[in-house]
């Protein structure tokens, strides 16, 4: 298995590192440094049904070609003693994001943590390091703007180095907030976008910019079950956004190719290649279970009245989101290229694709 070598990307299939082990880097992103790609994310290897283990730290991998990834280790280890600590392995740590601060020469990582006992309590943990591989020093754990902050993305404006955070103020709206110059806090200035109610309110923001247009991919709130991606386009931070159509095309559009986007990576060796980095959290969901049925099971909101009458269907659907039955240790990755029709991003399914074919 250690001799496995890839020369293409196979979305949704098991992806092994250069040691022959399944890659564990969920909900994170990719950063390019000195001709090397670094892929970081949640380590879910121990998150098996009924284990009580939500995560086992933040992993990082390195690669020269984005096909073959070397395991560099756990760059943020879990806390194992104090179960009240936000980084304890039973706490719901998700979606690490890293940006580099040129002023302080620090790598700055933010991590979302949902309280294991009360999911309505969510905060951020901020850490810094001199090297992408650590060691990382914890700076603070806090509620930005005094809010319970859910899924998020960090954004660094390459023109002036100013940074922003997009996060979902849980179950209500999307927030765009300015970061301080050291990227360790928010300034207090923010704007509000996409207000709604579950399951339609947006989460999992993934930002990218192309040809002076800014974009945000988001998903609805259906636990780990996939749903249609939404695209919003805007000209400047804090200005109103224009809602576009679902970027996914074809038969897999309604469930975003059975995935949830965590980041969009602009490939640095091509002029116009953007890659949607997504997780397939659940690999064994029957295709007849659709996201509206899951929504009905989760929220009982009447969005799927026929299925609302089918208790057996709802029970089957809801079980895939329960900690005692779901198995995120088996989660996989769905990486797909993004093409554009004018200013509209399009994501199409490929069983296999090569980066070189899009450069």
Residue ranges and their predicted role:
Residues 1-359:
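Carbohydrate-active catalytic/glycan-binding domains of CAZyme proteins
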